[in-house]
């Protein structure tokens, strides 16, 4: 996890502009570099480094002697870089995984390069020989990327929007900043004056398509067919491999553990893989919650079962409420469910950074979207409609759960790794018949649970534990986190303010006092940037007025049972 920043065609003093780059310093606390592009006085790169791989030679922009015309600034991890290096017999100058991007690009161009990358990434690649600039982002947008571009060709790129909003440009006082779409790359012409012109924007990968790099994977051969035992065996193979490849780091590994199905499977598989790799330190797992939190109890059971070095972080409602301003600033969104769920993740990340030496943190993000884990999937009118909704959620991850996971950890200089969003695992899961993936017998994620039923990987009661949203599970059923927040904002937002909400906030007008409060905080930090969120996250098919799972009939029935 790092922070990248780049300008092309700036008409303001670069020494002034680069102050904006310092707004993402939290993403890379280990080192910083600011470098002008040779021959272009108005083009530059900025890089904040979190040293995870090759601490000695990992600074950016990456430049190697063989390709003096290439400049690369990227944030991410390329898990198959050694496999690609060996297969194509590339001569490396460093041990940095991102160097593979330069070699692949020189060999086959940008399309082949980006399709061959197995990992998570956001990059800016400059080729001064062909006068081209390339931007690219991974399939699910696990690594963030924002851009601002004016009609006269000024381009600014950054890992977080906050690094762009204060930039100056003579022709455009208010720069339009927008997220770069996941699963896309863009080609731009670089003009002699340092400005750029967009040539094409290409969607290079659909989430259900098997990635091109699968041809070179080390995964053992999968069995053909959709018989249930065959499918379960293939899923175990792919999930184990998804975790194993993510062990690539020179820093200590930890794992978030809520006690839910997803984080428990990740933690248990991770500990198993660390033992097989003969890592010399125990796995640290981390859970957060208030008193009487069901997550804390469940996480404790899992930690005892797998034998991890477990940490429990307690917080109270006052601490959670006090963190809201920092959380919304870090997130760059005002989405209600995202803000709710981010408070606990922000506080536990803060604890990890301050009290432990774990830096690379595993988590279960992406599973609910992939495996139809949200409770409202019980109400899907058909398997096909459930499949459509699952793919929509995956396409929008970069606006919600992936955004939350990245910003709350990056705010404290941690790197998050999410095995459920592995290309091979997710594309195989999406290739299964729709009727295999829907909830069964009143239980969501039935196929995933069934896959690991006989493995003794995690306790049976956890394997079949009903879905509990992270923002709900950190508090007791009697006093849910969303209720605590709603009680607080009741005294911060009055009825007169709500009556004027549509006039004050015509776009994405908040419908509740909680939404109004978050929007106020957001506008204070990012005035006029409400369009970063296209819509609020909300369950389908059930006429929900609140995103919390605890407001749904299915959840209430499960609790009573």
Curated annotation (Swiss-Prot):
Where Phosphothreonine occurs, the residues are 545
Which stretches make up the Asparagine synthetase domain? 213-536
Q: What is its EC number?
A: 6.3.5.4
* Domain (Glutamine amidotransferase type-2): residue spans on this chain: 2-191
An annotated GO cellular component: cytosol
Q: Where does ATP bind?
A: 256, 288, 363-364
> Keywords assigned by UniProt?
Acetylation, Amino-acid biosynthesis, Asparagine biosynthesis, ATP-binding, Glutamine amidotransferase, Ligase, Nucleotide-binding, Phosphoprotein
Modification Phosphoserine occurs at: 557
Any Gene Ontology biological process: L-asparagine biosynthetic process
Q: Which domain of life is it from?
A: Eukaryota
Site entry (Important for beta-aspartyl-AMP intermediate formation), positions: 365
Q: What is this protein called?
A: Asparagine synthetase [glutamine-hydrolyzing]
């Amino acid at each position: 996890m790092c922070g990248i920043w780049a300008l092309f065609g700036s008409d303001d003093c670069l020494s002034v502009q680069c102050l904006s780059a310092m707004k993402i310093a939290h993403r890379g606390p280990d080192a910083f570099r600011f470098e002008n592009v040779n021959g272009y006085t108005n083009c530059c790169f900025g890089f904040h480094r979190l040293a995870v791989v090759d601490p000695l030679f990992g600074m950016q922009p990456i430049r190697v002697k063989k390709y003096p015309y290439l400049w690369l600034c990227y944030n991410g991890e390329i898990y198959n870089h050694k496999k690609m290096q060996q297969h194509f017999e590339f001569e490396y100058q460093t041990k940095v995984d991102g160097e593979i991007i330069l070699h692949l690009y020189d060999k086959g161009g940008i399309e082949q390069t980006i399709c061959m990358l197995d990992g998570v990434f956001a990059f800016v690649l400059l080729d001064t020989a062909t006068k081209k600039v390339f931007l690219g982002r991974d399939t699910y947008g696990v690594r963030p990327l924002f851009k601002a571009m004016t009609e006269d060709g000024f381009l600014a790129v950054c890992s977080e929007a906050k690094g762009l909003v204060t930039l100056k440009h003579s022709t455009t006082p208010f720069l339009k900043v927008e997220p770069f779409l996941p699963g896309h790359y863009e080609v731009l012409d670089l003009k002699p004056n340092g400005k750029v012109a967009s040539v094409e924007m290409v969607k290079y990968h659909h989430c259900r398509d098997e990635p091109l790099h699968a041809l070179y994977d080390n995964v053992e051969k999968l069995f053909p067919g959709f018989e249930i035992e065959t499918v379960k065996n293939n899923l175990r193979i792919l999930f184990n491999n998804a975790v194993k490849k993510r062990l690539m780091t020179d820093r200590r590994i930890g794992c978030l553990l809520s006690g839910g199905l997803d984080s428990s499977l990740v933690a248990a598989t991770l500990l198993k893989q660390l033992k097989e790799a003969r890592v010399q330190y125990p796995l640290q797992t981390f859970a957060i919650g208030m008193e009487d939190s069901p997550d804390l109890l469940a996480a404790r059971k899992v930690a005892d079962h797998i034998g991890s070095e477990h940490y429990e972080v307690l917080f109270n409602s006052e601490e959670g409420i006090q963190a809201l301003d920092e959380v919304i600033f870090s997130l760059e969104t005002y989405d209600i469910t995202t803000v709710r769920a981010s408070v606990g993740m922000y506080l536990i990340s803060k604890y990890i950074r301050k009290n432990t030496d774990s830096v690379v943190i595993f988590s279960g993000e992406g599973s609910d979207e992939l495996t139809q884990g949200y409770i409202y999937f019980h109400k899907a009118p058909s398997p096909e409609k459930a499949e459509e909704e699952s793919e929509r959620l995956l396409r929008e991850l970069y606006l919600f759960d992936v955004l939350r996971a990245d910003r709350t950890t990056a705010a404290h200089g941690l790197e998050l790794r999410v095995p459920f969003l592995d290309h091979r695992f997710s594309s195989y899961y999406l290739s299964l018949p729709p009727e295999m993936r829907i909830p069964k017998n009143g239980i969501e994620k039935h196929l995933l649970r069934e896959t690991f039923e006989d493995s003794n990987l995690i306790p049976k009661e956890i394997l079949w534990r009903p879905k509990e949203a992270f923002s709900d599970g950190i508090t007791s059923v009697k006093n849910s986190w969303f209720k605590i927040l709603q009680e607080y904002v009741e005294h911060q937002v009055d009825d007169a303010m709500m009556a004027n909400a549509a006039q004050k906030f015509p776009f994405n007008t908040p419908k509740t006092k909680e939404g109004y409060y978050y929007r106020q905080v957001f506008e204070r930090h990012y005035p006029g940037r409400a369009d970063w969120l296209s819509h609020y996250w909300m369950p389908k098919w059930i006429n929900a007025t609140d995103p919390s799972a605890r407001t749904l009939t299915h959840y209430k029935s499960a609790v009573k049972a």
